[in-house]
Amino acid sequence: MKRCIKFTIFLLLMASMIFTFASCTKVEVADGEIVAIFQYGDVDITKSMTHEDSETVRKMFNKKNLYSDSPSCGFSENVALIAGGDTYCIACDDCGTLYSVNEDKYFNLSDKENETLRKLLGKYGFTFPCV
């Protein structure tokens, strides 16, 4: 009897682990144009990113794990990147967390990636913090 119970518990644990790992959603930025939007204060910028910059962003975002949370970082669709109809809101402070509007989930960049992204967006007129 004990053996049967242990085996059942083992199967349940394995099933829950498989479900957990199989349900992990990852960022997949669509190929093509990425539009940078920065509408803050008196600034109203909507610009297509260069192919090179779009590829940098795509490589940075793709395969990042999406998760549900309520981070304290401030997000707005007025400070965002749009790719293939997907909107990625950039934290208005210096936080390395981004919000995927379409997935209603968040993902993180490393400190180096966050710094690279903010420098890249500076070329398009973005300024941080913008809270």
Describe each model-derived feature in a short phrase.
Residues 14-17:
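Residue-level signal for mature regions of secreted extracellular proteins and peptides
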Residues 19-23:
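C-terminal motif of bacterial Sec signal peptides marking the signal peptidase cleavage site
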Residues 24-131:
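Function-determining sites in protein domains
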